[in-house]
């Protein structure tokens, strides 16, 4: 639309979009509802001049309502984002690949991350920061001094503590809205199925080939997407296994052992 100010833009958009837009976004006096976040070129309008903010040719205006509507509801018990969540995740909601509905899916998701070491540390931190609703972290190890140069979630005061217990405390501080489950268990053929049960995605950040085979087998049995990654020195690999759609980990690497 062609508009000189944000207020002018709202007036013209409401005329074009009709009653549904007005009901969701505007108060009776035509001003934006309190649960609406407005961004102009990535900057929150509330920190500018509000509705009097001047617009230029090419400006991009994002209107993010805090209430989802009708068929856009993404799952049980999660139908909207709070005003605080909209503000917190605003920079990623603006991405076309995520958007409002994508953020709802993240809030609804349950992700299991197995291994909270060199790979798992940044993975669980990013998942919690971006608003994944439920994260299950699995690792039986304790924190060692030699971990600290790459496992930056931990510090010297944490040495000797169980990794998942310490990680869970720090993740809850990072994002109190995320549910963190910690399991200080080993992964093997007897435990893997129970570990992944009920999760939407499993992320493998293990340092054991035998444990990875067991995790792969459990994900295939439960039909859970399995993201696996490994690093040796300065090289690494990462790929996603989709049960019944792609090759599994054992299909790709049928004869690995801990030594090789």
PLM features per residue range, with description:
Residues 73-260:
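Adenine nucleotide-associated cytosolic modules
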